[in-house]
């Protein structure tokens, strides 16, 4: 068994270094099995006949009985429907990300209960995605410090961020300008994510084209920004996700740069200081920060990775592509207050639920994000 583990570790080190970036290989740390069991076929279909889930790009577990989903429209199924169809496009070996001509802008936002059944369908907001030439919704978040539990939805393609009431009945705020990309204080260019500081400030990961993180005050007024395009300390080749941790720490995933950039807040609310970078990833996708560690998902190979705040790899488990329970991409993940894990697949087109194994080492379980519990 030991030679196989060593071989896997060597493979991970080899593929984790982005092309064109010469660097010392990063020790992978322990590699082992997932500490979770999948709840098979949890995400129950509710689309009209002829359609399936689209790319599940955003998942946020507000509670064990309310899981918010942002999906990139629905996927038009082939007709006649093959017998092997199992409730999601991936079961037909169809990739909802690459087969964009089958995308239909309907049921873009909805919620699920603990059993994976649809609770709310926010179809009144489908028009905010209609006509999009690209993937559209990218993340869905709620600030742990917001008593009103407003829902933030980032639309990458339209360069906009929408803030909804908790029940989805009202659109409270629109940031950015639809179809207008810009690098000034009022515009975005392919925004990707949003995070929240305890004092009410908001961090906008902006994004794939602007390569910056924008800082807003509690009233959503511009304060400052940090980052910039490049491979140097604190720069980005594309900010894909962002999260906040204790001690004023800010963790931003530099997707194309294959690293995590770490910053810290300062006494000046408009400025942060660069702390460190954690290199050696291929395409880091999403992040959850806990009290003393953080978890990310990475692509090529698809995996969950746990690190401490110094960047040391503490544990890794690989995510297989094999169906019925596999993934092509864990684009987003979330954990509820009961410790259940949810992972959205942007390519197979579904969200899966995982429960901790009875014999799991608790140190290997992902907890709800810092500040949320």
Model feature map: region roles:
Residues 6-16:
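Bacterial N-terminal signal peptides
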Residues 23-373:
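Eukaryotic scaffold repeat domains enriched in small/polar residues
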Residues 18-22:
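Sec/Tat signal peptide C-region and signal peptidase I cleavage site
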Residues 1-5:
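Positively charged n-region of N-terminal signal peptides that target proteins for export
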């Amino acid at each position: 068994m030991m030679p196989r583990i060593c071989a896997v570790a060597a493979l991970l080190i080899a593929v984790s270094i982005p092309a064109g970036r010469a660097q010392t290989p990063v020790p992978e740390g322990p590699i082992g099995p997932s500490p979770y069991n999948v709840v098979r076929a949890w995400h129950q279909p509710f689309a009209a006949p002829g359609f399936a889930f689209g790319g599940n790009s955003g998942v946020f577990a507000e509670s064990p009985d309310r899981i918010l989903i942002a999906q990139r429209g629905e996927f038009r199924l082939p007709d006649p429907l093959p017998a092997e169809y199992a409730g999601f496009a991936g079961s037909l070996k169809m990739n909802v990300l690459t087969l964009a001509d089958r995308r239909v802008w309907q049921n873009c936002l909805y919620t699920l209960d603990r059993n994976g059944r649809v609770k709310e369908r926010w179809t009144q907001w489908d028009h905010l995605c209609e006509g999009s030439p690209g993937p559209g919704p990218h993340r869905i978040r709620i600030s742990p410090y917001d008593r009103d539990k407003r829902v933030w939805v980032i639309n990458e393609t339209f360069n906009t961020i929408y803030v909804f009431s908790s029940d989805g009945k009202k659109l409270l705020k629109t940031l950015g300008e639809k179809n207008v990309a810009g690098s000034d204080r009022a515009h975005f260019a392919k925004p990707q994510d949003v995070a929240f500081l305890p004092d009410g400030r908001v961090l906008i990961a902006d994004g794939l084209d602007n390569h910056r993180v924008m800082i807003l005050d509690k009233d959503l007024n511009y304060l400052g920004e940090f980052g910039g395009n490049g491979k140097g300390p604190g720069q980005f080749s594309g900010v894909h996700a962002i999260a906040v941790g204790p001690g004023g720490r800010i963790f931003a995933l530099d997707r194309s740069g294959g690293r995590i950039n770490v910053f810290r807040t300062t006494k000046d609310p408009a400025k942060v200081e660069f702390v460190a970078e954690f290199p050696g990833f291929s395409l880091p996708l999403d992040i959850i920060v806990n009290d003393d560690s953080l978890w990310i998902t990475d692509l090529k190979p698809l995996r969950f990775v746990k690190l401490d705040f110094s960047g040391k790899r503490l544990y890794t488990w690989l995510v297989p592509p094999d169906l019925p329970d596999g993934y092509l991409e864990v684009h987003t993940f979330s954990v509820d207050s009961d410790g259940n894990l949810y992972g959205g697949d942007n390519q197979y087109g579904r969200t899966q639920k995982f429960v901790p194994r009875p014999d799991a080492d608790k140190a290997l379980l992902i907890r709800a994000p810092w500040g949320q519990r």
